[in-house]
């Protein structure tokens, strides 16, 4: 295991926001907005940045993320943007790093800020550099996914794990805020 930078803050969204975001993800799954992820079974996602699916509540939370992570003026990541991720029982995210030519060619880093909207138990926790990170519901965690291998355990839940992911382009000298 190697060291990695991580910022995690509890209660980033309210209970009301949690309920609205959870219902929105479930509705989007039922409407076919969230598509099966080709990287594994029981995984669904939708890139929502710049689409009609990026609702006012998502934009409001995005602004709060910009303030929290002190990234005013940093653009939304052009490769992954903002994503809704839903994983059902038996799904998992494989170990990987998010390395894209855009970031290397432009000498920038990709900051990913994730909100744990729903998690039924600890199998929903992210794994970063081989360490299980305890992220409670309504918390946000941010890290540089091109520098840290990340994944999940096999998700064992009755209700899906729902995470909203907000990606930004930050300068190479960017450091995560200390909690």
Cite the ranges covered by each PLM segment:
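A short beta-loop-beta micro-motif enriched in histidine and acidic residues
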Residues: 78-79, 94-112
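Nucleic-acid-interacting cores, centered on viral/eukaryotic replication and modification enzymes
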Residues: 83, 91-93, 100, 129, ...
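Short, conserved beta-strand element in jelly-roll/cupin
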Residues: 86-88, 104-122, 167
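Catalytic core of Fe(II)/2-oxoglutarate
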Residues: 119-179
